[in-house]
Amino acid sequence: VYTPSEINSGIGTVLDYFRKEFKGCTLSDLEYVGDERNRDFISYAERVGADEVLVFRSNFDVDERGGDGSLNPNTSYMGWLWILARTNGGEWEHVDHGY
């Protein structure tokens, strides 16, 4: 459904958010979930008035401080999802993350 350029733009959005909000964490893997699985998340886009959704799965490690304190210290989070949305081919925006 999405071009490599659109997916790369989404990766940039996730990386920017991760760097800003997940201090003390190290991202080890980030991948597009694929067109088929991506469709399962369209309701997230609709909730914010968008018409497209892009979903990534990631793995990351948390340092001994627990990142900002909301994560378990010295833990690896596997299969963490990042949900992005946009309208009419605009910029991707982070709308949710988690399991």
Please place each PLM-identified region on the residue numbering.
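Flexible low-complexity loop/turn motifs enriched in small/helix-breaking residues
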Residues: 1-76
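Short beta-strand edge/turn micro-motifs at domain boundaries
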Residues: 77-99
